[in-house]
Amino acid sequence: MRHKRSAKRTKRASATQLYKTCKQAGTCPPDIIPKVEGKTIAEQILQYGSMGVFFGGLGIGTGSGTGGRTGYIPLGTRPPTATDTLAPVRPPLTVDPVGPSDPSIVSLVEETSFIDAGAPTSVPSIPPDVSGFSITTSTDTTPAILDINNTVTTVTTHNNPTFTDPSVLQPPTPAETGGHFTLSSSTISTHNYEEIPMDTFIVSTNPNTVTSSTPIPGSRPVARLGLYSRTTQQVKVVDPAFVTTPTKLITYDNPAYEGIDVDNTLYFSSNDNSINIAPDPDFLDIVALHRPALTSRRTGIRYSRIGNKQTLRTRSGKSIGAKVHYYYDLSTIDPAEEIELQTITPSTYTTTSHAASPTSINNGLYDIYADDFITDTSTTPVPSVPSTSLSGYIPANTTIPFGGAYNIPLVSGPDIPINITDQAPSLIPIVPGSPQYTIIADAGDFYLHPSYYMLRKRRKRLPYFFSDVSLAA
C-alpha cells in the first residue's frame, strides 16, 4: 500500500517582512503591527509599570529590549576584548620609485656631507647674453672634471673674559703622615687680563693631630652591648675570682685551663651523658663565657660578661639555653657627705674715737679669767714718810692671754692701779728721805678682740694658754 505523500508546508514570512509590505497597503494581520511597534499588552504593562518602579538601569520594563547598558551577550561566547598593542608613532616612510635606468645594487652607506666653516666664497656674476640661449648636445661619456681653487680662510678669535676658564689650582703635593710639614698650592693662570694676587692656604699639623690621607668612611655609631634586654637574665656575682679566674666558678681545677687569657671568650665542653656540677650554682650549664666589658653605672664601675647556657640539646645537635648577664661591681660611688660649716668670727673690728675708761675695760677683761687669778696673792706694807712718797717692793701676779686658735690683734690696754693704804710709820728712819720708786711691768702689752667683750663668764674649758709674769719695783 502506497503512502500518500503530504504536501510541502510553505514557510510564512517573518513579522518584520510582512510589516514592510503590508503597512503601506493596510492589509497587515492584527498581530503584526503591535508586535513590530512594541504595543502588545505585555509591553504596555511593562512600559507603564516602569514609570513607578526603578530597576537600576537593568533594562527591565523599558520596552527597548536592549538588555540594559551592557546589552545582551549570546550564550557560549566571550565578550570582545581589546587586543591592540600601543606603539609609538613613527614617521611615515617615503618610498622612491625605481626607474628602469637605475642600478640594481643599492648602496647601504649613506653619503657624508661636509660643511666647510669659514668665510663664504664669492660667486662671480655672469652678465646676461643678449643673443639668446645656445643649446649644445654631446654624446661624450667622459665624466666632467671641475677645477675648484682652494680658498684661503682667515679665522680671528677673541677671548671673552666671561667664558674664559677660571684659574686652575695644582693639587697639593703628597706628604707623609708624620712630623711637621706644610702644604701650599701655587696658582696657574690661563687668562690675559689683570692678575690679582691670591692668598696661599697653609695647613700645618703636628704629630699629635696627624690625619691619614686615606678617605675615612662614615663613622658608625657604637653598637649597644644589649646587657639589659628583656631576654637576658641578670645575675650578680660576689666572688672576686670572677674578674681574675672565672674558670674556677664554672669547673673545678683543671690543668687544661691554667694560663688561659681571661680577656677572650671562654668555651667549656659539655657531656650529655653526665651531669656537670659547677662550683658556683649560678654558673651551672655554662658552655660559653664571652669577653668582658667595663661599663659605667650611677653606682660605680661594673665588670660584665655574657654567658650562654646549654640547658637542653635536641637530637639534631641544636643547643637550647638561656642568655645570662654576669656582673661584678668593682667600686661604689657613695653619696657626697654634707659637712656643716661653722661661722668664723670676723677678724675686722671698728675702732671708736673716744677712749674707754679703765674700769669698764678691766671689768670685761677679768670676766673671762678664773677666780684664783683675780685676787692678789700677797700685799706687803711699805714704810712711808709724811711727804707723800711711797717706797717698797710689791710682788704681784697677773695673767696675760697669748695667741690661741685665732689671730688676736693687739690693742693698747689700760693701766693696772695698785691700791695701798697709807700707814703711820712705827719707826722714823735716820735718813731724812728715800728716793721714789717706779713700777715696771716685765711683760708686753696685748690687745683683746672686740668680739670677746660680749662673752659670758665661763669657768674651765678655756681655749687659751696662761703664763705668769712678775712685777718688779
Curated annotation (Swiss-Prot):
It comes from Human papillomavirus type 16. The gene is L2. Disulfide bonds join C22-C28. Its main location: virion. HPV16, in comparison to HPV types 6 and 11, is more often associated with malignant genital cancers in humans. One of its GO terms (molecular function) is structural molecule activity. Belongs to the papillomaviridae L2 protein family. InterPro entries: Late_L2 (IPR000784). This is Minor capsid protein L2. GO terms for biological process: microtubule-dependent intracellular transport of viral material towards nucleus; symbiont entry into host cell; viral penetration into host nucleus. Changing C28S: Complete loss of infectivity. Keywords: Capsid protein, Cytoplasmic inwards viral transport, Disulfide bond, DNA-binding, Host endosome, Host Golgi apparatus, Host nucleus, Host-virus interaction, Late protein, Microtubular inwards viral transport, Phosphoprotein, Viral penetration into host nucleus, Virion, Virus entry into host cell. Minor protein of the capsid that localizes along the inner surface of the virion, within the central cavities beneath the L1 pentamers. Plays a role in capsid stabilization through interaction with the major capsid protein L1. Once the virion enters the host cell, L2 escorts the genomic DNA into the nucleus by promoting escape from the endosomal compartments and traffic through the host Golgi network.
